[in-house]
UniProtKB/Swiss-Prot annotation:
NAD(+) binds at residues 30-34, 79-80, 105, 128, 162, 301. It comes from Campylobacter jejuni (strain RM1221). It comes from the Bacteria. Keywords: DNA damage, DNA repair, DNA replication, Ligase, Magnesium, Manganese, Metal-binding, NAD, Zinc. One of its GO terms (molecular function) is metal ion binding. This is DNA ligase. PANTHER family: CHROMOSOME TRANSMISSION FIDELITY FACTOR 18, DNA LIGASE. Its EC number is 6.5.1.2. The active site is at residue 107. Residues 570-647 form the BRCT domain.
């Protein structure tokens, strides 16, 4: 079997596997599927360097489904900014305007979980998802022994933390899987994530998962320090790691980091760094967020594990923008439970800087524990068999002449197959138009048969375009066509994300959608640059893209019926620009009051400070009302609030 035939069989096996396990609509008999898997295993045993990461023999998709209901978080689950050394930590602290009183704790390498409690009872559990909406895994959460199902606190509260698998338990799980001839988990993080997303809750239960809280989302707590919040949460019955402390200054933070780094191998669970957070909640509220991160906390990452291997070749990848990226082909090396066979070389200027050659021994790390990269070349170990890595002159895909601008080498052929295919794959991906069933292999198959050649051509596909293609039967074709039709009515921000504009990701796309609606591509440089979290680089990228693609976006609007979320804010009322805190029991849910305040241009905070303008209180208002009176903040009941919003 040749490589091309092997990859075609991988695609077919995945098609059959998804149909059987995810859609419950078999496209082949059990005997045919088993025979195909045996063919793949024979090839892979003989060609270990050619194994596709997409092969069904390399993953456990049949037991990990994506068929969970979606559940919205009451408050967004943010990512964290990463810092990797002392200078970056000090730069972060300077931006955070904080030089003292930091809360620190280990950053466990697991799966984030959001728990919702109401009236003291656990009512739901959800994965992080996209930060705003996660997967409803409540049934599995109830199988995690150390998560309290009832707590003494009766107000509604979201408690967030990390689900981990202990290293010893991870080894036992893999030993059991090996005995069952099942593929092994690469690391405890993947095992924890997979264990949470089981359709069979008994599997989750037997995995012995542990939950460590690290924060809260929606809450009505009245503390002034994050450390007080966490102490309260742990007193409700949650686990506390023994390395949690307050640091008076950055020097103490650095000392704690060094201590924790020494404990890295001794800890029973995987860690990839230390969380550093401003402890003062009022300052946290003042600092706020970028479009992606809270400004008041950072992940001080550990140095990635580093190993030596040999560079045996260089592959050239053509991105959807045409940029040529050299990728080092490595002799396989295990880094922190992950077998690494390739590493980024970024660009040819980086190759020159490293003075790296084919057959060199190199040091490779997983930068940020995610992307493998080469950091050092051991020139003293050269044996005379090394070969220079030449700058390419022709595109490896279409053979057209490349534009060499130094750092950037680019294929300018807009019809280059790799550019088009990668653009289409991105366009239909989960975070973009999310066309179910139109994955990477299917896109490549359709492009190969000239059924799709542009982004727009996706919406012109017909039933007869699929007839005769391997693996497609009537029901499968109709399902895919229905998914394409549904994608015509996707959210505007998904469409903006799908266009692949440089520097504009999902978060920025949502900001554009909310700020400008359907007119997002008709704005000025100043309008873009003035958006919160944007800057000159993003604004320039948007201006250039919209200038070139203005007419094309108009044409897309004729093909699509985009859902547009527009946040209408009244800017001439007495509430505009005012900060509210809501406490006590009101006649309607707090979310309704919050939505009204925000619509009128106000802001709702979770804690009372000198910057609070109004406290809206109801029955059984607690310490927030008392604190507001101490600070002489204006306190109004529901009747006074109703009069205020009429003005």
């Amino acid at each position: 079997m040749k490589k091309e035939e092997y990859l075609e069989k991988v695609a077919l096996a995945n098609l059959w596997m998804r149909a059987y396990y995810e859609k419950d609509e078999p496209l082949a008999s059990d005997e045919e599927y088993d025979a195909l898997i045996r063919e793949l295993r024979v090839f892979e045993e003989q060609n270990k360097d050619e194994i596709s990461k997409d092969s069904p023999t390399q993953k456990i998709a049949p037991t990990i489904q994506s068929e969970f209901k979606k559940i919205a978080h009451l408050k967004r689950m943010w990512s964290m900014e990463d810092v990797f050394d002392e200078s970056e930590l000090r730069a972060w602290a300077k931006r955070a305007k904080c030089e003292k009183n930091f809360f620190i704790e280990p950053k466990f390498d697991g799966a984030s979980l959001n728990l919702l409690y109401e009236n003291g009872k656990l009512v739901s559990g959800a994965t992080r998802g996209d930060g705003e909406v996660g997967e409803d895994i409540t049934l599995n959460v109830f199988e995690i022994e150390n998560i309290p199902k009832n707590i003494a606190y009766k107000e509604r509260i979201e408690i967030r933390g990390e689900v981990v698998i202990l290293k010893d338990d991870f080894e036992k799980i893999n030993e059991k899987r090996a005995l069952l001839n099942q593929s092994l988990f690469a690391n405890p993080r993947n095992a924890a994530s997979g264990s949470l997303r089981q359709l069979d809750t008994s599997i989750t239960k037997e995995r012995n998962l542990k939950f460590y809280p690290w924060g809260v989302g929606e809450n009505t707590l009245n503390f002034t320090k994050h450390s007080e919040v966490m102490q309260f949460i742990r007193e409700l019955g949650f686990l506390k790691d023994d390395f949690v402390r307050l640091c008076a200054n950055l020097d103490e933070v650095l000392k704690a980091y060094d201590e924790l780094l020494v404990l890295r191998e001794k800890k029973p669970m995987m860690m990839d760094g230390m969380v550093v957070r401003v402890d003062d909640l009022a300052l946290c509220e003042e600092l706020g967020y970028t479009v992606k991160f809270p400004k008041f906390m950072a992940a001080f990452k550990f140095p990635a594990l580093e190993k030596t291997t040999r560079l045996i070749g260089v592959n050239l990848q053509v991105g959807r923008s045409g940029a040529i990226t050299p990728v080092a082909v490595l002799e396989p090396v295990n880094l922190d439970g992950v077998v690494v066979k390739s590493a980024t070389l970024h660009n040819f200027d980086e190759i020159a800087r490293l003075d790296v050659k084919i057959n060199d021994f190199v040091s490779v790390i997983r930068s940020g524990d995610v992307i493998p990269k080469i950091t050092k070349v051991f020139k003293e170990r050269r044996e005379g068999l090394e070969m220079e890595i030449s700058r390419p002159k022709l595109c490896p895909t279409c053979q057209s002449e490349l534009l060499d601008e130094g750092t950037l080498i680019k294929c300018q052929n807009i019809d280059c197959e790799d550019r088009l295919v990668n653009s289409i794959i991105h366009f239909v991906s989960k975070k973009c138009l999310n066309i179910d069933g139109l994955g990477e292999n299917i896109v490549e198959l359709l492009y190969k048969h000239k059924k799709i050649t542009t982004l727009e051509s996706i919406f012109h596909l017909k039933f007869n375009d699929f007839e005769g293609l391997e693996g497609f039967k009537e029901k499968k074709i109709n399902n895919l066509l229905n998914a394409i039709e549904q994608a015509r009515e996707c959210e505007l921000f998904r469409f903006i994300t799908a266009l692949g504009i440089e520097h504009i990701g999902e978060v920025a796309a949502k900001k554009l959608s909310l700020s400008f609606g359907k007119e997002w591509y008709k704005q000025s440089f100043e309008a873009y640059a003035n958006l919160e979290g944007f800057g000159e680089q993003m604004a320039l990228s948007l201006c250039e893209f919209t200038r070139v693609n203005h007419t094309r976006i108009d044409e897309f609007y004729k093909l699509l019926n985009l859902k547009i979320e527009k946040l209408e804010i009244k800017s001439d009322g007495v509430i505009f620009g005012k900060t509210f805190v809501i406490t006590g029991t009101l006649s309607r849910p707090r979310d309704e009051f919050k939505a009204l305040i925000e619509k009128l241009g106000g802001k709702v905070s979770g804690s009372v400070s000198k910057k609070t303008d109004y406290v809206l209180f109801g029955e059984e208002a607690g310490s927030k009302l008392s604190k507001a009176k101490e600070l002489e903040v204006k306190c109004i009941d529901e009747s006074a609030f109703n009069e205020l919003v009429k003005e």
